[in-house]
Regions:
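Short Pro/Gly-enriched beta-strand edge/turn motifs at strand-loop
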Residues: 18-25, 79, 186-198
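Active-site acidic catalytic loop and adjacent metal/ATP-binding pocket
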Residues: 28-55, 191-236
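ATP/Mg2+ or Mg2+-diphosphate-binding catalytic cores
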Residues: 252-261, 298-351
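ATP-binding pocket architecture of kinase catalytic cores
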Residues: 30, 39-151
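Active-site activation/catalytic loop segments of kinase-like enzymes and analogous catalytic loops
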Residues: 80, 235-279, 295-314
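Active-site catalytic-loop/activation-segment of kinase and kinase-like phosphoryl-transfer enzymes
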Residues: 1-11, 110, 146-149, 153-195, ...
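All-alpha amphipathic helical-bundle segments outside canonical DNA-binding/catalytic cores
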Residues: 281-295
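Juxta-kinase regulatory segment immediately upstream of eukaryotic protein kinase catalytic domains
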Residues: 1-27
């Protein structure tokens, strides 16, 4: 397998015919993820009409402190998911695939983000955008609803294989925190069992996170990174996404930003739009229960799993442990109840 780098990317594109030979270009590595080599190739001359391009190559060894590996062919799960979602989501929401090189586990795609902001960075600055939360609810609801409507074409083949989801989520997140905190080993095993045996599965993104959401000048939300997609439980997406909003609420409080309540209000905005969009779910109350449990598990995993967040103070990490372990032990079933408990904890810490 040929290995992509900033030093050879432009030459490779010229040689393969993916970039015009008369257009000088430069390559720049994009940071933020841990699992792939991602490079932006763009014209050197700003006046050039040639659009920039994103190259992505799968890496077996992830860039984390703890050793973490995943199979190379997960990149074809990503391209398959992108092709499907490109047809069901609004234009410019998902990049368009330009070429694929099977032997190099590499593909090229259109660039959504050259002039975009990453929503994660806006949240870390304390910026509250209810409109983006609503857009996220619409997009995730559409993914889950469209998955159900196309279940015959999606539930077989690559998306039915959970190997990558296990390597990148179940093991480094759930099994890891169960070992660190044996008191929640049984609830965690129950979550895994529910995901595996859920009667009504759908397309699950499994990396639906503000770090993978690009915001343009008109507040349009673009979505990237689909390698963990699979045919599974939509509640995982809900818990995974909401965990990011809640964890950033801890940060906002610690920094003294006047946005704590507004951060939590974004959760309600997201949840309402999601429920309006994913209307084919068989048991909405059961989905909410599983979503709250995944929310607690994902929050704890970002403190004590293999890929912890780097923006929480030690005291906040302890608060996350107490809150989430309690929610899993008590089997908290309503999102509103979880948020009320969170608000009470915030008030206790500020009194």
């Amino acid at each position: 397998m040929w290995t992509l780098s900033t030093e050879n990317a432009v030459e490779h594109l010229h040689f393969a015919g993916y970039w015009p030979p008369h257009v000088p270009a430069q390559a720049r590595m994009l940071t933020g993820g841990v699992s792939n080599m991602v490079i932006r190739v763009e014209p050197i001359e700003p006046s050039s009409q040639q659009p920039s391009m994103i190259l992505k190559q799968s890496s077996e060894l992830l860039r984390t402190k703890a050793e973490w590996r995943s199979r190379l062919d997960r990149i074809w799960i990503e391209t398959e998911t992108m092709k499907f979602l490109g047809d069901v989501l609004p234009p410019q929401t998902v990049p368009v695939i330009l070429f694929e090189e099977q032997e190099n586990y590499l593909f090229g795609m259109t660039d959504l983000g050259q002039t975009c902001d990453v929503w994660k960075l806006l949240l870390l600055e304390g910026r509250v955008e209810p409109g983006l939360a609503r857009s996220a609810g619409l997009i995730l609801g559409t993914i889950h609803e469209s998955g159900l409507r196309h279940n015959e074409s999606l539930q077989n083949g690559r998306l039915a294989d959970w190997t990558v989801f296990d390597e990148l989520r179940i093991d480094p997140y759930y099994r890891t925190i169960a070992k660190v905190h044996p008191i929640i080993a049984e609830p965690i095993q129950q979550l895994i069992h529910q995901m595996e045996h859920l009667p009504q599965k759908t397309l699950v993104h499994a990396d639906f996170s503000p770090k993978n959401m690009l915001i343009d000048s008109e507040n349009h939300l673009g979505l990237v990174d689909f390698e963990t997609a699979h045919w599974g439980d939509p509640a995982f997406d809900l818990g995974f996404f909401l965990s990011h909003l809640v964890l950033k609420t801890f940060r906002a409080m610690r920094l003294g930003l006047p946005t704590r309540e507004e951060f939590l209000d974004m959760i309600s905005v997201f949840w309402e739009k999601y429920q309006d969009t994913f209307c084919s779910v068989e048991n909405a109350r059961a989905l909410e229960y599983r979503a709250v449990q995944h929310l607690a598990a994902c929050m704890l995993a970002r403190v004590d799993g293999k890929s912890p967040v780097d923006y929480l103070a030690e005291a906040d990490q302890d608060s996350v442990r107490v809150l989430t372990i309690e929610a899993m032990k008590n089997q908290t079933s309503r999102l509103e109840a979880f948020i009320l408990t969170l608000k009470d904890r915030f008030h206790q810490e500020t009194d």
